[in-house]
Amino acid sequence: MAVQGGLLSLWLWLWLSLLTVLLGARARWRGEGTTPHLQSIFLGRCAEYTTLLSLGNKNCTAIWEAFKGVLDKDPCSVLPSDYDLFINLSRHPIPRDKSLFWENNHLLVMSYGENTRRLVALCDVLYGKVGDFLSWCRQENASGLDYQSCPTSEDCENNAVDSYWKSASMQYSRDSSGVINVMLNGSEPKGAYPTRGFFADFEIPYLQKDKVTRIEIWVMHDVGGPNVESCGEGSVKILEDRLEALGFQHSCINDYRPVKFLMCVDHSTHPDCIMNSASASMRRESASLHAIGDASLLISLLVALASSSQA
């Protein structure tokens, strides 16, 4: 009995020890941990961007030093204002009519913008590029970065990554001018325009009305749907009414054709894309008919000239 009791106690001790280890290994926060090699990625992106866009007046090392100050702060005590120096050192002009705001279609926006060749989204300006798709935060009760998890808005409002994007969004809006393009996802189940989100809370309020000509909304639907919302419907109507109340000239287009063409590149035979292909075929056939007609006319003229010369 004593042996059995000892084995039971040992088993219980091992079980409790394992449980303690497992609980200790659980992530503290809901978000991804700090991206490995954060500094190297940051500096590499900065160097590439400033070289390609000829921003020779930017000091990437100084920009990193300004950014990394937040890495010494409690992970739930980082404010947008903590990025002020970083923003001031990294900001640069955005070409007029080239700003592209968005919600729920990050990758499509990146593809269409094509590294600032067509349009310039927030992730295409220097202060957005260096942090895009990255995560960072300090450990909660210790120095050093937390590579296991970082807080999201569900954990605390003033987390390092959300505060970064809030600060960047506000500056991006202030620097935008002319025609403002907005790409929304009309297939998003929760609605194309989140009434609480970065665009609604940290971009629209900071647009400079005297610098904005008009706002053009593109409601894009996934190839194959679903078509949850379109212009004048649901949350899109809420956005249109808000812009109207703020005094902005605005328009709305469902499935803006240049973007839709890009979406159809990988779905050329899908029914949603067939009309585009058919239109192109019709244009090709029309061009061929014109060419045939021109050739026939030329032959007729040559025959007529030959006949008149023989006469």
Swiss-Prot record:
Keyword set, alphabetical order: Cell membrane, Disulfide bond, Glycoprotein, GPI-anchor, Hydrolase, Lipoprotein, Membrane, NAD, Signal, Transferase
Signal peptide: 1-24
Principal cellular location given in the protein's record: membrane
Family matches, as Pfam families: Rib_hydrolayse
Glycosylation-annotated residues: 59, 88, 141, 185
GO MF terms held by the record: NAD+ nucleosidase activity, cyclic ADP-ribose generating; transferase activity
Pro-sequence residue ranges: 287-311
Disulfide bond positions: 46-60, 76-156, 137-150, 231-252, 264-273
Catalysed conversion reaction: NAD(+) + H2O = ADP-D-ribose + nicotinamide + H(+); NAD(+) = cyclic ADP-beta-D-ribose + nicotinamide + H(+); cyclic ADP-beta-D-ribose + H2O = ADP-D-ribose
Top EC class of this enzyme: hydrolase
Localization (cell): Cell membrane
The family this protein is said to belong to: Belongs to the ADP-ribosyl cyclase family.
Function as written in the Swiss-Prot or TrEMBL entry: Catalyzes both the synthesis of cyclic ADP-beta-D-ribose (cADPR) from NAD(+), and its hydrolysis to ADP-D-ribose (ADPR). Cyclic ADPR is known to serve as an endogenous second messenger that elicits calcium release from intracellular stores, and thus regulates the mobilization of intracellular calcium. May be involved in pre-B-cell growth.
Protein name (Swiss-Prot/TrEMBL): ADP-ribosyl cyclase/cyclic ADP-ribose hydrolase 2
Organism: Mus musculus (Mouse)
Lineage: Eukaryota, Metazoa, Chordata, Craniata, Vertebrata
Gene: Bst1
